[in-house]
Amino acid sequence: MSRSINLDELRKKALESKKKNEEDESNDSDKEDGEISEDDPVIDQSNSVPPMKVPTFPEQIPQLPPFDRFPGTNANFFPFGAPFMLPPALMFGPNTVPFFPQTASSNKTFSKRKRSSENSFNNRNKAKSSETSDSSNTSQSFKENRALKDTATSRPLALSSDTSYQKSEKAKSEKSPFLSTSKNSDANYSKTTNQKEAEKAVSQLFEVGVRFNDFIAEGIEPSVVHTLFLKLGLDSSSASSQGSLTLSADKAARSAKLRKIDSNLSDTHILPGDNGTPTVLPERKNLISLPLLKQDDWLSSSKPFGSSTPNVVIEFDSDDDGDDFSNSKIEQSNLEKPPSNSENGLTMSRSDYLALLRNKEEEIRRMTKLILRLESNKKPYRSPTSAADMKLPSVPVAAVDNKSKTHLDTFEKVVDLSSKADFVEAGPSISSSGASSSAATTNSDTTEQILEAPWLRKTEQIAVVHEEHPAQIKKSEIDILNNLIEKEEGELTKYQTLVKSKTEILTQLYTRKKQLLEQQGKGNVACLPKESDLSMDSITEVSAQADENSSQILSSKTSNAPNGTTETDFEDKVPLVDYISPFYRFKSYRFNQQFVERVPLKYRSLTYSNKIEPMKVFCKYETTGGVCNDDHCEASHFRDIKMTDDEIIQDLSRYIEGNDEIEKESYKSGLDIVMKNTDENTDFVDVATRIVEYHNLWKSERMTIPVAKVSI
C-alpha cells in the first residue's frame, strides 16, 4: 500500500528553508569579501538538508485545517524527501515555488547589494597610483561598475569580472542547490545541470502518477512542461494510467521538423524544398477557350438503331444451266417505300417501323422458302430405304467368345441407329405456281447440308443424313467380321504357343524332380502327372473344333461352368508335395523320431532354442544379414539365443512326463539311469538321442486307448 504524504508539512518546511536562504544572502551582502561572519552556521557536509528553524514570521505560514494523523489516500501523492522543489528551470510563471500557495514573500524582491561591497575587492587591490587619480577617472570607473552591477543582476549566469560575486554565487549554490530565484529564466540556463535535474524530477513524478494537468494546476508554465514532456518522450494527455510511460517519439520528431510557411504572400508559395527557400511561381494566364469543331452532317443526322428504314438486298446465283428454273425470272416484290424523314419532314412512329420490319421479315421468309424449293428441285432427296433391307444376317451367339460379342454388339447398335434414323424431307411443297417439289430426281450420292436461317421461326428444321446403299452396308459388315475372325485366330495362336512353352517347362521340371528323388532312393512316380495330361492332343482338338464349329465349343463350356466362366479356369493343377506335420512348430518337436532327419542342424538348431523370447522381436539389422554392435539395442539377437551342448542336454532332461507324482518319480528314476550309463567321452548327439528314445519308450508303454463298454 502506497504511503500518503502531507503537503501542508512540506509547504511549511519549504517556506522555512526559503526564509533562511534570504537571511544568508542578506548577510553575505553586508560582509566584506574574504571575511567569515560569526553568525554563519557551520554547514555539515554529511547532511545536504539544511537544519530546520522555527519560522519568525507567522504571517507567512497560511492557516491550514488541523492535521490528521491518518489522512485518506491522496490521488496526487509525492514520495520524495522534504523539502521538495522542482529545479528553477521550470519556474517561468508568477509562482516561483511549485506545489505551494502563492504568498507575498514569493513576490518579494531581494535587496540589492551595496556599491561598496560589490567593489570592495577591487578597491582593496587597487594600486597606489590609482588612488591619486583625478575625479574624472573615479566617476568613469563608478559608471562602469554600475553598469557591471546591472548586468550581473539581470543575468546571473553571465561571465563577470568580479571574483567576489562568483564566490558568493558558488556558496549559495552549495548551501541550497534546489532553491534559486526567478533570475534563472534565461535560455542559457537550460544548458546547465539544472535542466537535467528538471528532466529527472519530471520523469520520477510521471512514474509516480503525476500528469500534465497536475503540473499546470500547480502554476508551472504549460509550454515548459510540454517541452519537457516531448523531450522525455512522455505522453502529455490528461487521461493516462498510473505508472505508464507512453513514448511519443513520433510527435517529437514531427515537432522538430516543423517549418514555417508564409501564407500572407500573394503570388509566392513556400514549398518544402531542401534549403527551405521560397519558390516564386509564375502567374497564371487566362486560357483562351478554343472554338468547337464543326460536326459533319452525317454525324448530326445519325439515328439510333432501329429508327432508320431497313433495306434488304437478296441476290441469286443462276449460273446452273441445267435447272428447270434457270430461265425463269423471279419477280421482285413491289413493296411500298415508307416515307423518309427527308422527304416528308415527319418522324415515323414506332408502330410504323415495327409494321415495316414485319413486312420485310415476311418477304425474307418467302424468298428463303423459294431458295429452298429451288435447291430441292436441283438435287432432290431420295426416299429412305426400309428397315427390313438394313437388317443383318443372324449371327449365332455361341459362335464367338465374350470379346467378339462386344464388337458385334457395338456394330449392331450402329446399324440399328442408321436403319431407324428419321429422314426428314425438305419442307412442305412451296411454289408460287403450284408445282410439286418432288417432281425431279437425280442419281447423285451426296447432298448439300442446308444451314438453318435464324429468322425462320415457322419453318420446319431440315436434317440431312448420309445414306448408304444396302450393298455397301453388307460389305462393311463382312469386313468387320473378317477383321474380328483374324484377330481371334491370332490370339488363339498366341495362346497355343504359350501353352506349348509352359508344357515343355513343366515337363522339364517334373523330370528333374524325378531324377533327384531317384538319387535319394525315394522316387515317387505317382506324384508326377500323366503324359496324356502333358500332351497337346486335347489342345489341338479344341483348336480344330473351334475352326470348324466354334459355337458348339463355347456352348458346351459355358453350360457346365458357373457364372459364364469356362472349365479351364478350374483346371489349374497344383503339384503334389510331401506331408508336413503341424507339430513341427512346437519346441517338443525335438522328441519326434523324424526331427533328426528333417532338421539340418538337428538339436543345435536355433529355431528350437528355448532362449527365444516369443514376445520380443529380432533385430532388424541382423535379420537382413548384418551384425548389430549396439549395446543399447533392446531387440533379440542371434548371439543371445545360442545354447551350448550342456544347456541343450539339461533342457531335454527337464521335460518330466507323468500325470501324477508316482509317474513323474518313475520317469525321473529311469532318466537318471540313462544319464549314469553315459560316459564323459560320449558324443553330444548320442546323449541327446538316448534321452529322446527313453522319452518315447516311456510314453509308448503308458499310452492307453479308452474303450467304451460294449455289450455283445
Curated annotation (Swiss-Prot):
KO phenotype (gene knockout): Cold sensitive. Decreases degradation of mRNA containing a DSR (determinant of selective removal) region. Abnormal meiRNA nuclear dot formation in zygote. meiRNA dot formation in haploid cells.
InterPro entries reported in the protein's UniProt record: Putative_zinc-finger_domain, Red1
UniProt key word Lyase: no
GO CC, alphabetical: chromatin; cleavage body; heterochromatin island; Mei2 nuclear dot complex; MTREC complex; nuclear body; nuclear exosome focus; nucleolar peripheral inclusion body
Compositionally skewed regions (Polar residues) per UniProt: 178-193, 327-348, 545-567
Start-end of C3H1-type zinc fingers: 618-639
GO molecular function list: protein-macromolecule adaptor activity; zinc ion binding
Biased composition (Low complexity): 130-141
Localization in the cell: Nucleus
Assigned keywords, A-Z: Coiled coil, Metal-binding, Nucleus, Zinc, Zinc-finger
Ranges in a coiled coil: 5-32, 351-379, 471-501
Transmembrane segments: none
Regions of compositional bias (Acidic residues) in chain numbering: 23-42
Compositional bias (Basic and acidic residues): 1-22
Region (Disordered) residue spans: 1-71, 107-195, 323-348, 428-447, 545-568
GO annotation terms (biological process): nuclear mRNA surveillance of meiosis-specific transcripts; nuclear mRNA surveillance of spliceosomal pre-mRNA splicing; regulatory ncRNA-mediated gene silencing; siRNA-independent facultative heterochromatin formation; sno(s)RNA processing
Function: Promotes the exosome-mediated degradation of mRNAs containing a DSR (determinant of selective removal) signal sequence from mitotic cells.
Protein name: NURS complex subunit red1
